Amino acid sequence: MPCHLSPPYRCAMESREQPEDVVSSARLETFADGVFAIAITLLVLEIRIPDPGENVSRALVDLWPSFLAYVTSFLTIGTIWTDHHRLFTVIRGTTHGFLFVNILLLMPIAFLPYPTAVVARHWFEGKDQVVPAMLLYGGTIALVAIMFRVMWLYASSRGLLVAEAASSRAVRRRGELIYRLAPLIYVLGAAASVIDPILSLIVFLGLAVYWLSPSRRGANSSRP
C-alpha cells in the first residue's frame, strides 16, 4: 500500500527504517583539502623573523626548535591528508552523520598550528614548561587519530565502503588494526615527553616519515 494511503504511524516507521541518503563526497573532500591547506600554511607564520641589527646566524640557530616543530607538524599534516585521501578511495559516498564526523576530524587539524607554536616558544623555558606543551601537541595529534577511527567505524558500520572494501576481510582487518593502534601510538609519543621532550618530538617526526615512506605505501597499496 502506498505510504500516503497508509496510517501515519506506518509511514513514520518506514521512514525510520530507510537508511540515510548517500551522496557524493566531492564537496566534503574539497572542503577538507582547504582546511588542510590553511593549517599547513599557518605553521610557517609562527617562525620568528630575526630583527634588524640582530645576528642572523645566531638567531637562526636559536630558532632550531621552531624549525624542528615546523617540519614535524608539516609532515604530520601531510600524513593526515594522505590518510584522509586514501580513506576516501574506499568510501562510496557520504551521509549527514559522516559529514559531522569529518567536521570533528578537521577541528584538531585546524588547531595543530597552535600547539606547534606553544612548543617552539617555550622550548628553552625548562622541562616543566615544555612537557605540558608537548602533551598538548601530542594530545592534538592523538585526537586526530581517534577521529580517524571513529570515521572508519562509522563508514564500515553504515555501509559507506565501496563493494570491494566491504567484501574484503583483509582490508577491513587492516583498517581495524591501524585505526585502533594509531591513537595509542600517538598517546605514547606524547607521554614520552615526560622522559625527554626532544624524544617525544623525534617520535612524532619519525612516525610522520614512516607513514609517508614511499616503500611502505607501495607495500600497502590496498590499505584504507
Regions inferred by a protein language model and the residue ranges of each:
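Multi-pass alpha-helical transmembrane bundle typical of ion/small-solute transporters
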Residues: 3-224
